[in-house]
Amino acid sequence: MMLGGGGGCGAGGTWLGFLVFLAVSLRNHSTCEDIDAEDRLMVDLFRGYNSLVQPVRNRSELPMIVKIGMQLVLLINVDEKEQVMHTNVWLTMKWDDFQLKWDPRDYANITQIRVAPEKVWLPDIVLFNNADGNYEVSFMCNVLILSTGTVLWVPPAIYKSSCIIDVEFFPFDDQLCSLTFGSWTYNRDEIKLDFLTSDRVDFSEYSTSSIWDMMDGPAVLTSDRSRIEFQIRIRRKTLFYTVVLILPTVLMAFLNVTVFYLPTASGEKMGLTMNVLLSIVVFLLLVSKILPPTSSSIPLVAKYLLLTFVLNIITIMVTTIICNIYFRSPITHRLPPWVRKVFLDILPLLMCMQRPHRKNVIQRSHRRLLETGPSVEENPMRSGEHHPLCRHTHNQDSCRRVRIQSDELDDELSPEAQRAIDAIEFITENRRDEEITKQFRDDWKFIASVVDRFLLYGFFGATVGGTIGIIFTAPSVFETFDENATLVKLKQLYDMGLANDTVLGIF
């Protein structure tokens, strides 16, 4: 029993090995037949084929239709200074070649083959608006040929195309760049272009950019269908420029306003304005290095910098005038009545500036003079009747009477006492003149403070108005944009082959 069982197992193993050998042999035979069939197909297809001749039976079949599609893979860069867009695309071209048809049943059911591009006729489609002299694709990949005679060529390419940059709303700007393709040697009567599957750019393999948001990608055919233009509409991501350029510029503009809040006596007004001026010049140079030197429009950020620059220049001028007013004195300048009326009475009231009343100041000054001035109590005359102080009393009759009595007693004073009285009179006159001069200087200083406050309000309003009127005029300042959702809708539009952008409500 055991021996019999062992013999059965040996026979079963032999049969299993034979079946495996037979299957492998049949598979190798089938593979060899497929290879032989493909070789025969290649020989049959390209026997007498001329890749330099346009594949049409006769001239009546012209113009030949070449369908083109473009798949955007990567937006590498947009150089605003050079006005060049750098992209990585897959260009898809499709046409029919009657010489490359076959019956798959005659060639082991082979429905498609891949051949080198130099073996077949290729349409000389080039990028017309290239910016580096490279008109053709950079990599000559294989051509896919179907049994129906349809030829499909999908060469990848990295293009540098010219793009007119609109800098009016920089950095809150949208740009519309295009890639224009067409035949270099065939005219419109020999080749006509058409869309491959949709009149749009294919974004199915697109990798998002860290600088630009993709908004749309329509395609346009010229009226004679000799050229096709793939448009790429993009919007700049503004976070970087907002933090690095916009916010510092706005802060500098408002820092320029604080000059009028800085006391003139500190001596730092002019230093602050000059530092702000140098900062603005640095930012202007930075913007000039980023943007193209175009004269068609002034960039939004350049407008704001120019406004800040002009306000700073005016600030320097009026600060010089304020410093001149602050250090005026009655010796060099006379205070006109209208200046006193406007800057000491009207403007302080309008700007809620309070100043102690002039009479109270004079009375306190006189009281201070009486308390700290020289005394004549040791003189035989009463101190209240000494004539140098009679000017400070309110009783003019008493003053005249004291002066008469003082003149009658001048002869009775010794020379030393007379010299002392003259010295006291001289000192008193000087103190009185100093008080009057100080009062006039205080008036000029207060006028300078009033002008400072008036310009503080005026320049603050101008800065706020300029900020709102310039920066907030950009169309996309307050718009939120979801690039991922937009790309999903653009892919749906491409798959549907729609020409109407409003179907999905994107824009």
UniProtKB/Swiss-Prot annotation:
Presence of keyword Transmembrane helix: yes
Chain ranges on the Extracellular side, renumbered to this chain: 32-138
Observed effect of gene inactivation: RNAi-mediated knockdown causes a resistance to nicotine-mediated paralysis.
Compartment(s) of residence: Postsynaptic cell membrane; Cell membrane
GO cellular component, one term: neuron projection
GO BP annotation list: chemical synaptic transmission; inorganic cation transmembrane transport; monoatomic ion transmembrane transport; regulation of egg-laying behavior; regulation of locomotion; regulation of membrane potential
Cysteines paired by S-S bonds: C163-C177
Keyword Cell membrane belongs to the record: yes
Chain intervals with Basic and acidic residues compositional bias: 379-392
Spans annotated as Disordered: 373-392
Secretion signal span: 1-31
Membrane topology of the entry: Multi-pass membrane protein
GO molecular function, one term: transmembrane signaling receptor activity
Glycosylation sites: N28, N58, N109
Membrane-spanning parts: 139-159, 243-263, 271-291, 305-325, 454-474
Job description of the protein: Non-alpha subunit of nicotinic acetylcholine receptor (nAChR). Involved in nAChR sensitivity to nicotine.
Matches recorded under NCBIfam families: LIC
Membership in a protein family: Belongs to the ligand-gated ion channel (TC 1.A.9) family. Acetylcholine receptor (TC 1.A.9.1) subfamily.
Protein name: Acetylcholine receptor subunit beta-type lev-1
Species of the source: Caenorhabditis elegans
Primary gene name: lev-1
